[in-house]
Swiss-Prot record:
Reactions listed under catalytic activity: L-seryl-[protein] + ATP = O-phospho-L-seryl-[protein] + ADP + H(+); L-threonyl-[protein] + ATP = O-phospho-L-threonyl-[protein] + ADP + H(+)
Stated role: Serine/threonine-protein kinase involved in the process of chromatin assembly and probably also DNA replication, transcription, repair, and chromosome segregation. Negative regulator of amino acid starvation-induced autophagy.
Post-translational modification, as annotated: Phosphorylated. Autophosphorylated; phosphorylation promotes the assembly of higher order oligomers and enzymatic activity.
Domain of life: Eukaryota
Organism from which the protein derives: Danio rerio (Zebrafish)
Protein's UniProt name: Serine/threonine-protein kinase tousled-like 2
Pfam families (alphabetical): Pkinase
Encoding gene, per UniProt annotation: tlk2
Compositional bias annotation for Basic and acidic residues: 46-61
C-alpha cells in the first residue's frame, strides 16, 4: 500500500497531506477518525483510481511538508502521523469530525451493510440520509479496502408514509399524463392551425395573384377604351372643324393671334338670312307700289269721263295700271302671307343659329381640351401613387389640370386635380401656395354631405406638384349650362337653390362653421348635366373657417380681400378702410341671390357686361343698393321677394344662412299655404268689394 502511495505525483501527494494534516490536527490526535467523505466527495478527485496514503512507505518521503499552524498540536511524539491514521476510526469511542459535513455520527456500519440494508429513514426519503448514501456510494467506488471504511447515517422523522408517497406519485403521474395528453391535443390543434394558415396563405397569395391579373387587365382595357375615345373625339373634332369652324393663326405686324373662322353651317345660315332679308325688302317694295295702285273707295268714285283716260293709262304701262278693289285686296293678302312666311322662316333660322352656337361652344371647348391634353405631360395614361390611372383631361385652369381617372383600389371613377407650381416662383410663393392647398384639403376632407363633392385623397408628386382626388360627376357645371341655355324655368332654378341652401346649412351646423366665399355657377356641378337633377358644391379654395379665435359677434376679418369672383360677392367685401372688413355667412346668402337671379333672367343683376377690373374700378357692387327686375321672362312675386331678401345692401339687415334655410319660398308646404292664404284673402276682398258695390247700387 505504501508503494502505491509512493507512486503518486509529488505535488498531489503534498496537497493530500496538507489537506488531511490540516483537518486532523485541528481536532487533535484523539479525534482522528475523520471521515473520508471530504476526500471522496463528488468532483474532488479525477476519475483515476484513488491511491491512499497507506500505499506509500514513510521512509520514501524525500521532502518535508510546509509548516502548518496546526502542526504544533498534531505532534504527539518524535514523528508525525501517518496518512493511514486518518482512515481509521475509533469504534464508537468518539464523534466524527468531518469538516465538510459537520454531522455527528449516529450509526456505523460497513459499506455493504449501508448499501444493502438502508435505515427506515433513508427509505422514507430523508434528505440527510440520501446524502449519506450518495457519499458512501462514492467512497465504495473509489476505495480498494471497504473493510476500513465506515459510513455515517442520521435518522430523521418524516410525516410521509409509503401509502402517501405512492398516492402522491400516482397523482403526479396522472397529472403528468393529463398534461401530456393536453400537450398532445394542443400540438395537434397547433399543427391543424398551422396547416390551415399555410392553406390560407397559399389561397391569399393565389387571390393576390388573381387580383393583380384582374387589375392589370382592367388597366389594359381602360387604356384601350380611353385611346379609342380619344381617336373618336379627334375625328369628330376634325369633322366639326369644317361644319362649325376652326381657329386660324393671323399675323398682325410682328405678332400672331388666333382668329375664329366659321364653318359651312354658319355660312349657309348667313346666306339663308340674306335671302330672307332680300325677299322681305322686295315684298316691302311691292307693297309700296300696291299702295299707289290702290283704287279709290266707293265714296270717291271717279266720274265717267275719266274712263277713257284710265284705258289710255293702261296702254302706257302696267306700273300705272289702276287695280280694282278686289284685285288690290287680293294682292295685299298675298304680300301679307309672304311676309308671315318669311318671318316664320327667319325665326327658324334664328333657332338653328342659336343651336349651332351652342354646338360651336362645345366644339371650341373640345378643341381647347384636345390642345391642352396633347401638350400635357400626363397624356400617356400614367398611374399616379400606384393607384390612380389617368384616362383623359377634363379641363385646365391657371395652375392645375383635372383628369378623369380610375381608382384601381376602390374600383371607381374619380377626378384627379393636379396642381403644378411655376418653377420660376420663389420658394416663399411655392410654400404659400402649398400651404393654401393643404388648408383646402383639411377643410374639404372633413366634409360629408350629399350636396358637397367628396375629397378622397391627397398626395405629392414632386417638389413642384401635388394632387387631390375628388368625387367624379358626369355632368357639367351650372355656368356651362347657362351659357348653353341662357336661362331656365323657375321650378328648375328653385330646385337648384334649395339644394345649395341645404349644403350651406350643413356648412354652418358643423363645428367650426365654414363660409364658402366663392359660391358661383362654376362651382355648382350638375350631376346629370341637366337642371332637373341633383347638384354638388365644389372648390373650397377660398373658404373661411369661423373658429373662436377669428370669429366675433360682428363677423371675422377678411384677410383675402380682392380674391373671389366679383359678380357674386356682397358690398361689404369691397369696403376699403384702415381695418379689413368683417364678413359672415351672409356672404354666401348674397351669392345665392345673384345665382338665382341669373338662372331666372339669364344675366347677372350687377355688372353683367363688365369685367372684374371694371367692376373694381367703377365700384359697381358698392353702388348696388337695389335690384331691378326686367319685365320678361315672367317670374312669380315670391321669387322676386326671395331675391330681394338675399340682396339686401346692408349686411346687418340681410338674413343669414339659418334664416335662409327656413325661408317660406324654399319650404313647399309653407309656400303653398301662404299662396293659398293670399288667394283666399284676394277672393274675400273681391267678394266684399262686389257686395259693397251692389249695396251702393
Amino acid at each position: 500500500m505504501m508503494e502505491e502511495l509512493h507512486s503518486l505525483d509529488p505535488r498531489r501527494q503534498e496537497l493530500l497531506e496538507a489537506r488531511f494534516t490540516g483537518v486532523g490536527v485541528a481536532k487533535g490526535s484523539g479525534h482522528n477518525e475523520s471521515s473520508n467523505q471530504s476526500l471522496c466527495s463528488v468532483g474532488s478527485l479525477s476519475d483515476k483510481e484513488l491511491e491512499t496514503p497507506e500505499k506509500k512507505s514513510n521512509d520514501q518521503r524525500t521532502r518535508k511538508r510546509k509548516g502548518d499552524p496546526f502542526d504544533s498540536q498534531g505532534k504527539g511524539g518524535g514523528r508525525g502521523h501517518k496518512i493511514s491514521d486518518y482512515f481509521e476510526f475509533a469504534g464508537g469511542s468518539g464523534t466524527g469530525t468531518s469538516p465538510a459535513r459537520g454531522i455527528p455520527p449516529v450509526a456505523r456500519s460497513s459499506p455493504q451493510h449501508s448499501l444493502s440494508n438502508p435505515p427506515a429513514a433513508v427509505q422514507q426519503g430523508s434528505p440527510s440520509s440520501i446524502s449519506s448514501v450518495n457519499t458512501d456510494h462514492s467512497h465504495t467506488s473509489t476505495s480498494h479496502k471497504p473493510a476500513s471504511i465506515h459510513t455515517q447515517h442520521r435518522a430523521s422523522q418524516s410525516e410521509l408514509t409509503m401509502e402517501k408517497l405512492a398516492a402522491l406519485e400516482s397523482s403526479k403521474s396522472s397529472d403528468l399524463e393529463k398534461k401530456e395528453g393536453r400537450i398532445d391535443d394542443l400540438l395537434r390543434v397547433n399543427c391543424d392551425l398551422r396547416r390551415q394558415i399555410d392553406e390560407q396563405q397559399k389561397m391569399l397569395e393565389w387571390c393576390k395573384e388573381r387580383l393583380n391579373k384582374c387589375v392589370t387587365m382592367s388597366k389594359k382595357l381602360l387604356i384601350e377604351k380611353s385611346k379609342q375615345e380619344k381617336i373618336a373625339c379627334r375625328e369628330k373634332s376634325m369633322q366639326d372643324r369644317l361644319r362649325l369652324g376652326h381657329f386660324t393663326t393671323v399675323r398682325h405686324g410682328a405678332s400672331f393671334t388666333e382668329q375664329w373662322t366659321d364653318g359651312y353651317a354658319f355660312q349657309n345660315l348667313v346666306k339663308q338670312q340674306e335671302r330672307v332679308n332680300g325677299q322681305r325688302e322686295e315684298i316691302e317694295r311691292q307693297r309700296k307700289l300696291l299702295i299707289k295702285k290702290k283704287p279709290p273707295s266707293a265714296s270717291q268714285t271717279p266720274p265717267p269721263n275719266l274712263e277713257p283716260n284710265k284705258r289710255k293709262s293702261k296702254s302706257n304701262g302696267a306700273e300705272n295700271e289702276m287695280l280694282s278693289l278686289a284685285e288690290y285686296h287680293e294682292q295685299e293678302e298675298i304680300f301679307k302671307l309672304r311676309l308671315g312666311h318669311l318671318k316664320k322662316e327667319e325665326a327658324e333660322i334664328q333657332v338653328e343659329l342659336e343651336r349651332l352656337e351652342r354646338v360651336r361652344n362645345l366644339h371650341i371647348r373640345e378643341l381647347k381640351r384636345i390642345h391642352n391634353e396633347d401638350n400635357s405631360q400626363f397624356k400617356d395614361h400614367p398611374t399616379l401613387n400606384d393607384r390612380y390611372l389617368l384616362l383623359h383631361l377634363l379641363g385646365r385652369g391657371g395652375f392645375s389640370e383635372v383628369y378623369k381617372a380610375f381608382d384601381l383600389t376602390e374600383q371607381r371613377y374619380v377626378a384627379v386635380k393636379i396642381h403644378q407650381l411655376n418653377k420660376n416662383w420663389r420658394d416663399e410663393k411655392k410654400e404659400n401656395y402649398h400651404k393654401h392647398a393643404c388648408r383646402e384639403y383639411r377643410i374639404h376632407k372633413e366634409l360629408d354631405h350629399p350636396r358637397i363633392v367628396k375629397l378622397y385623397d391627397y398626395f405629392s408628386l414632386d417638389t413642384d406638384s401635388f394632387c387631390t382626388v375628388l368625387e367624379y360627376c358626369e355632368g357639367n357645371d351650372l355656368d356651362f349650362y347657362l351659357k348653353q341655355h341662357k336661362l331656365m324655368s323657375e321650378k328648375e332654378a328653385r330646385s337648384i337653390i334649395m339644394q345649395v341652401v341645404n349644403a350651406l346649412k350643413y356648412l354652418n351646423e358643423i363645428r367650426p362653421p365654414i363660409i364658402h366665399y366663392d359660391l358661383k355657377p362654376g362651382n355648382i356641378l350638375l350631376v346629370n348635366g341637366t337642371a332637373c337633377g341633383e347638384i354638388k358644391i365644389t372648390d373650397f379654395g377660398l373658404s373661411k373657417i369661423m373658429d373662436d379665435d377669428n370669429y366675433g359677434v360682428d363677423g371675422m376679418e377678411l384677410t383675402s380681400q380682392g380674391a373671389g369672383t366679383y359678380w357674386y360677392l356682397p358690398p361689404e367685401c369691397f369696403v376699403v378702410g384702415k381695418e379689413p372688413p368683417k364678413i359672415s355667412n351672409k356672404v354666401d346668402v348674397w351669392s345665392v341671390g345673384v345665382i338665382f337671379y341669373q338662372c331666372l333672367y339669364g344675366k347677372k343683376p350687377f355688372g353683367h357686361n363688365q369685367s372684374q377690373q371694371d367692376i373694381l374700378q367703377e365700384n359697381t357692387i358698392l353702388k348696388a343698393t337695389e335690384v331691378q327686375f326686367p319685365p320678361k321672362p315672367g317670374v312669380s312675386p315670391e321669387a322676386k321677394a326671395f331675391i330681394r331678401r338675399c340682396l339686401v345692401y346692408r349686411k346687418e339687415d340681410r338674413i343669414d344662412v339659418h334664416q335662409l334655410a327656413s325661408d317660406p319660398y324654399l319650404l313647399p308646404h309653407i309656400r303653398k299655404s301662404v299662396a293659398a292664404t293670399g288667394n283666399s284673402s284676394m277672393a274675400v276682398a273681391s267678394t266684399s268689394n262686389s257686395s259693397n258695390s251692389s249695396a251702393s247700387n
